[in-house]
Swiss-Prot record:
Reported function: Specifically methylates the pseudouridine at position 1915 (m3Psi1915) in 23S rRNA.
This protein's name: Ribosomal RNA large subunit methyltransferase H
Top EC group: transferase
Organism: Metamycoplasma arthritidis (strain 158L3-1) (Mycoplasma arthritidis)
Cellular component, GO, one term: cytoplasm
Amino acid sequence: MKLNIIAVGALTKEYKTLYEIYNKKVSFFSTINLIEIKEVTEPNIELKIKKETKLILEKIPKNSKVFYMSLTGKKMKSEEFASLLCEDNLTFIIGGSNGVEEKYFDNKICFSDLTFPHQLFRVILIEQIYRGFAINNNIKYHK
């Protein structure tokens, strides 16, 4: 199974430690290819969004089913999210702090109405990926 996470920005040491804890757990089921896009320094927000979106689109692996993590996306329970992980070649996208041009992304997922810091959200995403694999493999983790 191929899983990709494309995210704008890099994790600080503290968040990277948390991310790696779950990445190690996920590694029993799949390898996650993490692609970090450098945040664009641009005072014009609209132009910044366009540039970051272009960089993201260039990094999406061929034939990958893409899910953009968005406040306007579909809300789902952990079991439904777990069912997505039965497919191969998935890419999850976490845009920059100003978002992306959403018109390029048909599949959108929303984990919450709350807004999270992007670094924390990356940890939340990989935890949910692990939770999904635990559900699919009947591992006692999800309650």
